[in-house]
Swiss-Prot record:
Residues 265-276, 353-368 have a biased composition (Polar residues). It comes from Gallus gallus (Chicken). Its main location: nucleus. Residues 126-139, 252-262 have a biased composition (Pro residues). Residues 16-48 form the LisH domain. Pfam families: SSDP (PF04503). This is Single-stranded DNA-binding protein 3. InterPro entries: LisH, SSDP_DNA-bd. SMART domains: LisH. The gene is SSBP3. May be involved in transcription regulation of the alpha 2(I) collagen gene where it binds to the single-stranded polypyrimidine sequences in the promoter region. One of its GO terms (biological process) is positive regulation of transcription by RNA polymerase II.
Length: 368
């Protein structure tokens, strides 16, 4: 409260009494009580020189300020006269005082620090992400919306989410976004768990998200006219204008889920970048059953157990039914003979999103 420099001593009670006596004497002189002032000095035995200040004196001024504030207190302002300045002083002091409930809590302490726990902003069960890490989408313009893109549109404008994730489309099967309610697992496959991972445009699934023998998939926006079909009889026509959408051969020497063909994005104009499924999966004797749920092999771990199929242009099984038709993000052209791809479908960012179920029969299988 007081400075403790080398040339200044700490004020003591004696100094405070001297100051008060000086101010009393000064007050008596300013109010005209000169005899009382001299008597006061003689009675206290004052021996020092006194220097008077300007009237009305410090004691009088100090008292007036104190009294004004005292009368302006909330409990006395209605009965005592006071100035507006004194009232404003009390009101401002009450507003600036900390709340007795909160105390002196610093700002930004209303929320606990640290990262947000998992599931804090958890959505419905059908929209839960895969436990596997995935890269961020490469196309910031891909937003959720109606899948009404015409053929020949600019790649990169295909919405990232399938029909099951689109709130504007409620018809058909909830497909890959949630549990497979109407899709029986094909032969050689275990029960389907909560939805396999959906990969958006330009995104690759992690290697451990595909089961053994599953071809590597590099999904692209896939909205345009079909690519020409090669003369090889081992292929299935796909419709896509996106370099970067292809299905490589399964089990081609690399780890499961590793794309075998080089990314068509590196040579977009090459005639070699025909997106085909080159070879079937291994024979039934070497297959293993993998449950199609979020297990150790990822959400699509059971795809390696699919039956070989005939190359008559139909990719399907007798155990699959009830899937929506003519939906974007579908594999199209699979119900046509090789070399005659269709123009009315699109290959989107979701493998096995839904099948064209107009020209298949339970007896159709695909093999080489």
């Amino acid at each position: 409260m007081f400075a403790k420099g080398k040339g200044s001593a700490v004020p003591s009670d004696g100094q405070a009494r001297e100051k008060l006596a000086l101010y009393v004497y000064e007050y008596l002189l300013h109010v005209g009580a000169q005899k009382s002032a001299q008597t006061f000095l003689s009675e206290i035995r004052w021996e020092k020189n006194i220097t008077l200040g300007e009237p009305p004196g410090f004691l009088h001024s100090w008292w007036c300020v104190f009294w004004d504030l005292y009368c302006a207190a909330p409990e006395r302002r209605d009965t005592c006269e006071h100035s507006s300045e004194a009232k404003a002083f009390h009101d401002y002091s009450a507003a600036a005082a900390p709340s007795p409930v909160l105390g002196n809590i610093p700002p930004n302490d209303g929320m606990p620090g640290g990262p947000i726990p998992p599931g804090f902003f958890q959505g419905p069960p059908g929209s839960q992400p895969s436990p596997h890490a995935q890269p961020p989408p490469h196309n910031p313009n891909s937003m959720m919306g109606p899948h009404s893109q015409p053929p020949g549109a600019v790649p990169g404008t295909q919405p990232l989410l399938p029909n099951s994730m689109d709130p504007t489309r409620q018809q058909g099967h909830p497909n890959m976004g949630g549990p497979m309610q109407r899709m029986n697992p094909p032969r050689g496959m275990g029960p389907m768990g909560p939805g396999p991972q959906n990969y958006g445009s330009g995104m690759r699934p992690p290697p451990n998200s595909l089961g053994p023998g599953m071809p590597g998939i590099n999904m692209g926006p896939g909205a345009g006219r079909p690519w020409p079909n090669p003369s090889s009889a081992n292929s299935i026509p796909y419709s896509s204008s996106s370099p970067g959408t292809y299905v490589g051969p399964p089990g081609g020497g690399g780890p499961p889920g590793t794309p075998i063909m080089p990314s068509p994005a590196d040579s977009t104009n090459s005639s070699d970048n025909i997106y085909t499924m080159i070879n079937p999966v291994p024979p039934a004797g070497s297959r293993s059953n993998f449950p199609m749920g979020p297990g150790s092999d990822g959400p699509m771990g059971g795809m390696g157990g699919m039956e070989p199929h005939h190359m008559n242009g139909s990719l399907g099984s007798g155990d699959i039914d009830g899937l929506p038709k003519n939906s974007p993000n579908n594999i199209s052209g699979i119900s046509n003979p090789p070399g005659t791809p269709r123009d009315d479908g699109e290959l989107g960012g979701n493998f096995l999103h839904s099948f064209q179920n107009d020209n298949y029969s339970p007896s159709m299988t695909m093999s080489v």
